[in-house]
């Protein structure tokens, strides 16, 4: 038992929320970048809510360790109409014994999904930090004003500008849901420039193919598109997440497999409401 607890501590410390949230949000990100940062929204509407259960695995034992919920509602930003999207991830009592996880992400985008603002407040273990991004688009470029509040209270400011569109973990989720996955080819790689308050990731998606997924503990089955999220670091490519999204116009993630040094983690869709389109990927 002591050995299992030690291993579990290693896993939970390794499993930063960055991986969990990246997995949850990247599960819909199969879009290419372009100078046009907006896109017509056909995938979701105000009042959509998605719910997930989170699991860790060690020694072939799966344990539920938390939940995640995401909501999108109509709002205003700087006096203009916008979508307000939030993601809340919470560890349960089992996880709290080893690693506290309390995280909230907030995003504002225009009605055509152009990113305006992003904030992440993360309590991971004993460390709390905040990331903020403000977007503007001078002369057709994408300008980022970046702010990090470190766990020791230090404020770090930075500004960056790119010719291509840059996204955060929330806005890429919303944009990607509106792309036509039928145009993708098996094995195709799609660059994914995603920024936080400090770094721009060198990452991409690989389209794996189609599979049918049966939800654990139920009779629900979904036709899914399968993708891998890959990041290049220290000269090597690392598959961080493999995910399954509904093969319909909603493009909702129903399963995520996250690969860790000391084990693995999974997220499963628990429920949903307020979706815009019929869930035609669901098999009876």
Regions found by a protein language model. Give the residues of each.
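Sec-dependent N-terminal signal peptides
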Residues: 19-29
């Amino acid at each position: 038992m002591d050995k299992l607890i030690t291993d579990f501590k290693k896993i939970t410390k390794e499993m930063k929320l960055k991986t969990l949230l990246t997995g949850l949000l990247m599960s819909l990100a199969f879009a290419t970048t372009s100078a046009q940062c907006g896109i017509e929204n056909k995938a979701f509407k105000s009042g959509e809510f998605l719910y997930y259960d989170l699991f860790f695995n060690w020694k072939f034992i799966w344990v539920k360790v938390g939940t995640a919920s995401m909501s999108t509602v109509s709002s205003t930003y700087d006096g203009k109409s916008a979508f307000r999207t939030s993601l809340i991830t919470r560890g349960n009592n089992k996880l709290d014994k080893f690693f506290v996880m309390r995280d909230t992400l907030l995003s504002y985008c225009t009605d055509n999904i152009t990113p305006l603002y992003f904030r992440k407040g993360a309590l991971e273990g004993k460390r709390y930090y905040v990331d903020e991004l403000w977007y503007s688009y001078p002369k057709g470029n994408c300008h980022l004003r970046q702010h990090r509040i470190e766990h020791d209270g230090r404020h770090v400011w930075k500004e960056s500008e790119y010719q291509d569109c840059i996204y955060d973990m929330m806005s890429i989720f919303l944009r990607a849901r509106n792309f036509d996955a039928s145009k993708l080819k098996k094995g195709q790689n799609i660059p994914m420039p995603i920024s936080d308050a400090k770094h721009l990731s060198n990452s991409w998606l690989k389209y794996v193919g189609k599979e049918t997924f049966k939800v654990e503990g139920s009779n629900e089955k979904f036709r899914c598109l399968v993708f891998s999220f890959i990041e290049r670091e220290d000269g090597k490519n690392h598959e961080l997440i493999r995910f399954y999204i509904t093969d319909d116009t909603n493009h909702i993630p129903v399963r995520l497999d996250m690969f860790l040094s000391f084990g693995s983690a999974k997220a499963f869709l628990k429920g949903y409401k307020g979706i815009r389109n019929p869930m035609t990927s669901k098999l009876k």
